[in-house]
Amino acid sequence: MDIQFLGTGAGQPSKARNVSSLALKLLDEINEVWLFDCGEGTQNRILETTIRPRKVSKIFITHLHGDHIFGLPGFLSSRAFQANEEQTDLEIYGPQGIKSFVLTSLRVSGSRLPYRIHFHEFDQDSLGKILETDKFTVYAEELDHTIFCVGYRVMQKDLEGTLDAKKLKAAGVPFGPLFGKIKNGQDLVLEDGTEIKAADYISAPRPGKIITILGDTRKTDASVRLAVNADVLVHESTYGKGDEKIARNHGHSTNMQAAQVAVEAGAKRLLLNHISARFLSKDISKLKKDAATIFENVHVVKDLEEVEI
């Protein structure tokens, strides 16, 4: 499980950073890629990665500002031109209005897609659990921005315990089909009468990962709730230390506020995202250094960077 950042800039593209988009790569888990936001130029960034557009099965939009959605029509159209690859349907989750935006863009441009898009729109009254599969659950909660905006909490369901092969061999169980039966929870009786209780040879289930991906927001309790015990918290950092007032006026956060959210939520790792173009390389180091005085395990991400979860 990895996150690859396709755009880490704020507001408009710059030479160093494209606008908002990231890919949650779940290839080992479910052979899918989930996109979160799709700003202008996202498909260009994807061309610089190993991501295959057909593997993108779901797109989650945080809000309808242009720097988070203007790349959708282009990506959806390009996804249709995957030669020699089977076309697969796509699901888009986002605030009310995302369906109208996509369908209008496709209609006026005369674009016809050879696959179906299933839209899942929500408003302030229809948040909470928005998706559940056999391996993942996704929650959405409203943040505090200048327009309706949400954050997402992706929870991997607990993983099966592992089989203690060494202990089984010591108990006289021959390697082979019997191992598989025990792994599936089946109790056995060996030829010599030894009873093998499957539960004695399988470790406890392992907790799944928690990934929190926030849209644009002021510091808010909703961010903390979404990030409780998160393995990774992706939080915007449009402004730096000392800019709390201007950040609030524009519906954004500082690096220090993001660090405070990570502390209050008990998150394990903080990734600062949505970086303003006014920050030069030396300022990026300061963003991290300042935030680390509050939350030590912090990192400022850059375009095309891949982070293992």
UniProtKB/Swiss-Prot annotation:
Would you identify the family this protein belongs to, as annotated? Belongs to the RNase Z family.
Q: Which residues bind Zn(2+) 2?
A: 67-68, 216, 274
**Per UniProt, what is one GO molecular function of this protein?**
zinc ion binding
Give the source species. Streptococcus pneumoniae serotype 19F (strain G54)
Q: Which Gene3D superfamilies does the UniProt record give?
A: Ribonuclease Z/Hydroxyacylglutathione hydrolase-like
- Any binding details for the cofactor? Binds 2 Zn(2+) ions.
- Subunit annotation: Homodimer.
What HAMAP family is this protein classified in? RNase_Z_BN
Q: Which domain of life is it from?
A: Bacteria
Question: What does the UniProt function comment say about this protein?
Answer: Zinc phosphodiesterase, which displays some tRNA 3'-processing endonuclease activity. Probably involved in tRNA maturation, by removing a 3'-trailer from precursor tRNA.
Required co-factor(s) are:
Zn(2+)
- CDD domains xrefs: RNaseZ_ZiPD-like_MBL-fold
> Could you tell me which cysteines form disulfide bridges?
none
**What is this protein's record name?**
Ribonuclease Z
Going by the record, the broad EC class of this enzyme is hydrolase
Q: Which UniProt keywords apply?
A: Endonuclease, Hydrolase, Metal-binding, Nuclease, tRNA processing, Zinc
Q: Pfam families given for it?
A: Lactamase_B
Name the residues that bind Zn(2+) 1: 63, 65, 145, 216
- The EC number of this protein is 3.1.26.11
Catalysed reactions, semicolon-separated: Endonucleolytic cleavage of RNA, removing extra 3' nucleotides from tRNA precursor, generating 3' termini of tRNAs. A 3'-hydroxy group is left at the tRNA terminus and a 5'-phosphoryl group is left at the trailer molecule
Q: Which residues form the active site?
A: 67 (proton acceptor)
